[in-house]
Amino acid sequence: MPNNSTALSLANVTYITMEIFIGLCAIVGNVLVICVVKLNPSLQTTTFYFIVSLALADIAVGVLVMPLAIVVSLGITIHFYSCLFMTCLLLIFTHASIMSLLAIAVDRYLRVKLTVRYKRVTTHRRIWLALGLCWLVSFLVGLTPMFGWNMKLTSEYHRNVTFLSCQFVSVMRMDYMVYFSFLTWIFIPLVVMCAIYLDIFYIIRNKLSLNLSNSKETGAFYGREFKTAKSLFLVLFLFALSWLPLSIINCIIYFNGEVPQLVLYMGILLSHANSMMNPIVYAYKIKKFKETYLLILKACVVCHPSDSLDTSIEKNSE
């Protein structure tokens, strides 16, 4: 028994250390993303407003979700609904990310499909409405267990329990996780987004091959759109790669399969690590992001005044 307890303790320490590292990287990286969009006027477009929404969800993962995941992993004894609320927070920001990614995909589709009418369609009012809808859906889906779809109201064992050792599976129903959270609000949107990006690439390829106007400007426009779409599809691919393993683990648990603790920890860490991946993708794939990153970092290192930083970024964005 002591050996098992020591092994579990070592596993928890390693897990918590990794969560703290991922959380710090996610916070710093995504705060930098928001600063880049705020400082660079050329990045203040519809797509990048949705990217800021995605960054806010990732910051929330770092600030709120990861510490809560650590509390859950330690199995601290707390009130049932306090534990349930914490686990719901783990889900809200996941769905905020997927909804932001869906909004980005739809925006890029409108950009290449309605090239002439795009600016008339994507008004500021509609952008804010879309952002509000993304977060509203995320809160409704994530908080659904608080309204009854949980172990308290559906399990004989937990019905009379007020305080318990806080564990994800002790409060959260796996049928909710598998059928509602994963299949309905993660898997289906992922399939829809893949279809949207395939159509985007198809439209761009046709426009570039036909090039009916024989205009260099048109060719350059669709060339830029192709590069941007590839970068954003990579963000989507990394999200799927990060979250699908944990979703598969939840499916295995739901169908009474055995999942080793180490595998579960790795699935959780991989899903949380997605929050620190996007700033790296932007830096490598989007030139204006990379240039603004470097200007901000240079200003921080050599202590440039903010006015000179703004001037440098304005010149860079022209």
Swiss-Prot record:
It is found in: Cell membrane. It is a multi-pass membrane protein. Belongs to the G-protein coupled receptor 1 family. One of its GO terms (cellular component) is plasma membrane. Residues 38-48, 107-126, 199-231, 285-318 are cytoplasmic. A lipid is attached at residue 303 (S-palmitoyl cysteine). Disulfide bonds join 83-166. Glycans are attached at residues 3-4, 12. The lineage of its organism: Eukaryota, Metazoa, Chordata, Craniata, Vertebrata. The keyword Transmembrane helix applies. The keyword Metal-binding does not apply. The chain crosses the membrane at residues 15-37, 49-72, 85-106, 127-148, 178-198, 232-255, 262-284. Changing residue 105 to T: In a colorectal cancer sample; somatic mutation. Residues 1-14, 73-84, 149-177, 256-261 are extracellular. Gene3D superfamilies: Rhodopsin 7-helix transmembrane proteins. One of its GO terms (molecular function) is G protein-coupled adenosine receptor activity. Expressed in the lung and bone. Expressed at lower levels in osteosarcoma tissues (at protein level). Keywords: Cell membrane, Disulfide bond, G-protein coupled receptor, Glycoprotein, Lipoprotein, Membrane, Palmitate, Receptor, Transducer, Transmembrane, Transmembrane helix. This is Adenosine receptor A3. GO terms for biological process: activation of adenylate cyclase activity; G protein-coupled adenosine receptor signaling pathway; inflammatory response; negative regulation of cell migration; negative regulation of cell population proliferation; negative regulation of NF-kappaB transcription factor activity; presynaptic modulation of chemical synaptic transmission; regulation of heart contraction. InterPro entries: Adeno_A3_rcpt, Adenosn_rcpt, GPCR_Rhodpsn, GPCR_Rhodpsn_7TM.
